[in-house]
């Protein structure tokens, strides 16, 4: 199914699966060199795709250029896989008009969206505002007609994966700033080697705790995160060392509490909201945000609303 259709059909219970796909999406494509950007800018959207997107029967995904930085080695495989799945679905549904061209076009939209995500992440790290004109000039030249859908998808993925929101501050000139979602002041970019914002994972964990009822067993946290292919003992291309991030960094930053379950033998541990999280945001904000960008997989839709409404009344 094409990327746009996937988003349109996303249900609340598919939230973490959607995040998992997004995590694979935003880590597999190296940023283009100046020469590549110039060549891309002088071509139309479909023309760019014809030389870049593999055929439906291609045995392997495209590879990133050698020497790609760790900042952007996460995007090609998922795009290739989604394109391949789209081709398979088309075959099952029967012949359609120009299926190869349609697949290439959808892949081109996805590829441009990914380029824009990387561009906006660089702007966020530099703490610089960005205009629509700058996005068109730097990333989407000759793609003006497709700007609304590409920009919308890029904004959605920034929220979904990184917890970064694109906010329009001057509508007349289409000037935007990039800020962390929900008023959280942590993004995990304190060290020189920290290249990916970590706010998205923090929001996911806070949501899991809120849904579980003020505290969540450690195994429940890792069970949910495994749906994003984020595992306790495995280094992650976006979140680096997830175990250290949750059990040390976010605890030290007072966003999470990690404690032994009282009376447990053998010892079991659980996560709670830390004091900094309680000051900067709230259960209702986190739960509404979770519903807005895709929902939660295992807890049914109504209870999520009920909990948010209860807190709103309190």
Curated annotation (Swiss-Prot):
InterPro entries: MAGE (IPR037445), MAGE_N (IPR021072), MAGE_WH1 (IPR041898), MAGE_WH2 (IPR041899), MHD_dom (IPR002190)
Region: Disordered, residue numbers: 1-69
Tissue distribution of the protein: Expressed in many tumors of several types, such as melanoma, head and neck squamous cell carcinoma, lung carcinoma and breast carcinoma, but not in normal tissues except for testes.
SMART domains (alphabetical): MAGE, MAGE_N
Keyword set includes Transcription: yes
Bias-annotated ranges (Basic and acidic residues): 1-20
Domain MAGE positions: 109-308
Biased composition (Low complexity): 21-44
Example GO BP: negative regulation of protein acetylation
GO terms assigned for molecular function: DNA-binding transcription factor binding; histone deacetylase binding; ubiquitin protein ligase binding
Pfam families assigned: MAGE (PF01454), MAGE_N (PF12440)
Modified residues (Phosphoserine): 64
Keywords: Nucleus, Phosphoprotein, Transcription, Transcription regulation, Tumor antigen, Ubl conjugation pathway
GO cellular component: nucleus; PML body
Subcellular location, record wording: Nucleus; Nucleus, PML body
Function: Reduces p53/TP53 transactivation function through recruitment of HDAC3 to p53/TP53 transcription sites. Also represses p73/TP73 activity. Proposed to enhance ubiquitin ligase activity of RING-type zinc finger-containing E3 ubiquitin-protein ligases. In vitro enhances ubiquitin ligase activity of TRIM28 and stimulates p53/TP53 ubiquitination by TRIM28 potentially in presence of Ubl-conjugating enzyme UBE2H. Proposed to act through recruitment and/or stabilization of the Ubl-conjugating enzyme (E2) at the E3:substrate complex.
Assembly mode: Interacts with TRIM28 and UBE2H. Interacts with HDAC3. Interacts with PML (isoform PML-1, isoform PML-2, isoform PML-3, isoform PML-4 and isoform PML-5).
Name of the protein: Melanoma-associated antigen 2
Native organism taxonomy: Eukaryota, Metazoa, Chordata, Craniata, Vertebrata
